[in-house]
Amino acid sequence: MTILQSYTTQMVLLGTALLGLASGIAGTFAVLRKESLIGDGLSHAALPGVVIAFLLTGIKDIEVLIIGAALSSITAAWLITITVENSKIKFDGALATILSAFFGLGMVLLTYLQSLNNAGQAGLSKFIFGQAATILARDVYITSVAALIIIVLTALFWKELKLISFDVEYAKTLQIPVTFTLILYRSLLIMTIIIGIQSVGAILISSLLIAPAVGARQWTNKLGTMCILAGCFGMVSAIGGTIWSTTVQKLPTGPAIIVILSVVVLLSLIFAPNRGILWQFRKRGAP
């Protein structure tokens, strides 16, 4: 337990805990809107933004890389939207195509950057699978502030986010600013993704965004309870995965967090009352 007494480890745990909490809350609305795959597309799209930001500036500070990731994810979201609206391609087709293109571009740029033997690029590959051990106290501060902003915005616009999650047309009849709320919803997803790629990685951050909500949905039909449960599942998994990756040498943080989160979701799918597999078997076997 000595490693847990380290100030650096405590800061990293704080950052990943808040990230897990924010991810569970933001992902709840994506699951309810049946847009679980949007997180996958936006997270993969963030990678080329990270690399391009470094290529243009030569700076590896998290503030710079986050801006690159955000611009790249926003561009991907915009391309997905205009593709669906102006062609016969459906949402999943546009998402898969743009996801693959952006992530492929990111990998090509990362390979090119590594071939330059630029010492400054060391550590950028950690953005693929994540590595909490490389996070500095300043990075944790930025992550924590962003996570708190996500939580506060969700609380402030709770009614609006709830309505667009279930019935957009009904929200319009109530004079809810639907366009603004949809932009806010996508912004929450993008913000969660860009603050999480350093810890969890571009490949797996979408799982941290969606899986907690999937697990929480098994236990309740109430949105508020679902949000709280999803946040708790994300937070506990993030803490557990961070401790695991910190204590085991060369274990990336992202996979460690997702393995623990997968266990939580699996247990929810099996044991949750009313929706769980065991409960369903019990009901079928009842006379």
Show which residues each predicted segment covers.
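Cytosolic-side transmembrane-helix boundaries in multi-pass membrane proteins
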Residues: 251-287
